[in-house]
Amino acid sequence: MRRKNTDDFIIVYLSNDVSDFELELTWLKDHPQPYNLGECEFHLAFQAEDYEAAHKKHKEMRCICFENEAMGIYFIVDPDGYWLEILP
């Protein structure tokens, strides 16, 4: 288990020795009430083998819906409106 603590949030990464999948749990410290699953604070994330090429392709496709340059990540939106996180 890895953990990242900041002033705004805590992230815990859970994994095992059987696969290379990782579960990321995020707690936003300033969230005003208990989490409700209907808030859509969940999503899938994918690690790109070539982040720059993936970003270029997604930009050409006009499917980038949010970008956080400080964290080095961005999100694309699928045809059903779900956000997918792209990691380097």
Where are the model-predicted features located?
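Eukaryotic phosphotyrosine signaling hubs
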Residues: 39-43
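Acetyl-CoA-dependent GNAT
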Residues: 27-31, 88
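Short hydrophobic/aromatic beta-strand micro-patches
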Residues: 15, 45-49
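Vicinal oxygen chelate
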Residues: 10-13, 52-88
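Short hydrophobic-acidic sequence motifs that mark active-site Asp/Glu residues
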Residues: 22-24, 83
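Residues that form or immediately flank small-molecule/cofactor binding pockets and catalytic motifs
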Residues: 5, 30, 70
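Short secondary-structure boundary/capping segments
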Residues: 3, 13-15, 33-36, 65-66
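Core segments of cupin and vicinal oxygen chelate
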Residues: 1-22
